[in-house]
Amino acid sequence: MNKLLLLILFECIIFLSCSGKGSLESEIPKVSLIIDGTFDDKSFNESALNGIKKVKEEFKIEPVLKESSTNSYLSDLEGLKDTGSNLIWLIGYKFSDVAKSVSLQNPEIKYAIIDPVYSDEPIPANLVGMTFRSQEGAFLTGYIAAKVSKTGKIGFLGGIEGEIVDAFRYGYEAGAKYANKDIKISAYYIGSFADLEAGRSVATKMYSDGIDIIHHAAGLGGIGAIEVAKELGSGHYIIGVDGDQSYLAPNNIITSATKDVGRSLNIFTSNYLKTNTFEGGRLINYGLKEGVVGFIKNPKMIPFELEKEIDNLSSKIINQEIIVPYNKESYEKFIKE
């Protein structure tokens, strides 16, 4: 009889031990990250990857990472769901529509999207979007470009024309015109964020036309432009994007218009993991005021006096004394004022 009681007691202990372990593991949320393209773009996607790496280090989690493309979005997101993910990050405006549809289909999963393009339609309660006033940082880099250009001709190289890239373009052009109303600006789009050779080809043409500074927002196409500037040498300059890209061509990159996707991702995810709260159904907007967009200071390329001018402009933007345009319509209005 005593042996039977001991056996039952032992089995109960084993059961409770296993149950406790399962509960503990289930309390640790699983985070996933899906991108369009590759993580090694040295700008936008890589910034998101760096942000999730910091979360991994802080919380000792193993995030699920997925490189995807348009035709695979739904199947890849279904795969992330099957991993047991509690929070799924979608990086880039191309996920705008699919983010809404999967959120509605899976109300038990939290979704967060970077750079969504939404109008006034409702956002599901389990979806949050993060948008950026990229035009504010680009305004500052445009001002710098107009001030340091030797030829009086500067350019913009974009990936795919649309709301996200246009914010960089028109902010940049507005800043340049604010610095020098006579500056000549040319803009080109290569129709892709993944075409390095197209970036090289268009950048080569731009430099041959007398443009000495190119601001890119073209993903891998921008990397191609950086390669061309580096090969051509002195007098051929680039303004990078999203993060500090100066390490790619220290003698040719004047500055970078930063949009710290990784930081915003890190802040939101860390708060979610610490508090287990998720405030969805909304868009969160970041700009200079929040310290998420800006520019990289570079004493080698940007004189101290010019840096002081930029700091003054930053304050005016933060205080809304300057409202930076973000599209063609607001840009045309801005330069007429």
Swiss-Prot record:
Main location, first listed in the record: membrane
Signal sequence, start to end: 1-17
Annotated InterPro entries: BMP_lipoprotein (IPR050957), Peripla_BP_I (IPR028082), PnrA-like (IPR003760)
Covalently attached lipid (N-palmitoyl cysteine), positions: 18
Subcellular compartments: Cell inner membrane
Assigned GO CC terms: plasma membrane
Keywords, in A-Z order: Cell inner membrane, Cell membrane, Lipoprotein, Membrane, Palmitate, Signal, Transport
Membrane topology type: Lipid-anchor
SUPFAM superfamilies, per database record: Periplasmic binding protein-like I
Lipidation (S-diacylglycerol cysteine): 18
Keyword Chloroplast in record: no
Top-level taxon: Bacteria
Function noted in UniProt: Immunogenic protein. May be part of an ABC-type nucleoside uptake system involved in the purine salvage pathway.
Family to which the UniProt record says this protein belongs: Belongs to the BMP lipoprotein family.
Subunit composition and interactions: Monomer.
UniProt name for this protein: Basic membrane protein A1
Organism: Borrelia garinii subsp. bavariensis (strain ATCC BAA-2496 / DSM 23469 / PBi)
Lineage of origin: Bacteria, Pseudomonadati, Spirochaetota, Spirochaetia, Spirochaetales
